[in-house]
Amino acid sequence: MSNEFLETNNSFFDTVSTHVEFGSGKLNQIYEFLPDAKKALIVTTNGKSVKGNGYLDTLIENLNKKGIEYVVFDEIEPNPLNTTIDKGADVAKEEKCDIIIAIGGGSAMDASKAIALVANNPGKLWDYVQFGKGGKKTPQNKALPLVAIPTTPGTGSEADMGAVVSNNETKEKTAIFGQDLFPVLSIIDPELMVSVPEKYTAFQGFDAISHSLEGYINGIVNMYSDMYALEAVRNVHDYLPKAVNNGNDLEAREKVAFGSYLSGLVMSVGNTSSLHSLEHALSAYHHDLPHGLGLILLSKAYFKFLINKHVCDDRFVKLAKVMGIEDAEDPMDFITALDKFHKDIKVDGYKMSDYGVSPDEFEDMAHTAFDSMGILFTVDRYEFTVEDVVKIYEESFE
């Protein structure tokens, strides 16, 4: 059943409130842009790249120049967990931090937003989650100010008001939102992304393009989100294969970082689609599955399902043209372009079964998709059922 939406909405909103500094070498100048603060909680992942590549040292040098004290919390895992976020918030409270600085990939960005919220409010993160088994409480106070320094492209968290968080106990992966979760400052320095390994460049880059693919075919598109989405798709499609093949190609890194930022704006003035709901359920059950790879594994079956429902044929044709099929006339040309893109970024050989996914989980996953992030189904042009979602999982499975 199709939901009723306008082809394009000529009204839109824009509440993006982030000071953005984009360009190579910007991290070296961050002290010029940092807001006044007494003590920062620096949040990063439990990996080695931020420290090993010297990014953390550069940040600390700039904090010293600015006269801001700091403490480092470096325990964030991929698909950040509520328990880790609560621990980070406790550190921020104990150390009396008045600003949070995230440096790392999407997990560090999202975890930092959640830490910023919990650090300035009583209780724990899941008290404030509005979906699924969350406590649905309203925060008493605004989140602490956040500075975002992405070292990978992908989530667009440097430009949006949301954060994706996970709970292993409830098997939920959902999101929190709030105007105060926009970073006060985002430093987007493509030089920081040169060290990202090939496969993660591909996974994270696909997350970036997926935000805009979904943002262009959902039911709440507007002329503002369309502008961002098409330019994001063009940049990531044209330059991600180059970044995958040569990580030192700084122009490619810049264009992919720009596309990721634009995709963040798409989510801020529009939204994604239920493809993200399906993936969040998938990686909630299989925590080691990278989010971007989950989207890759689901994308062809998901978009093919919508194309067969003829919910927005012209938009899929337009995307096919932007993705290299200049004479596209059939919506299925988009699937052809998507399949080629998967090959170009070297992700066509991955399978769900590589990560322990089993078909007997699909029914439960489908219910989780609706329960934990059902809001995204409300913006789809087609009214999905649990059975539809199970079918997409099944067709994606290898």
Each model region followed by its residue ranges:
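ATP/NTP phosphate-donor binding region
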Residues: 2-99, 352
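C-terminal catalytic subdomain
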Residues: 270-333, 339
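Flexible, glycine/charged-enriched surface loops at secondary-structure junctions
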Residues: 219-228, 243-255, 270-275, 289, ...
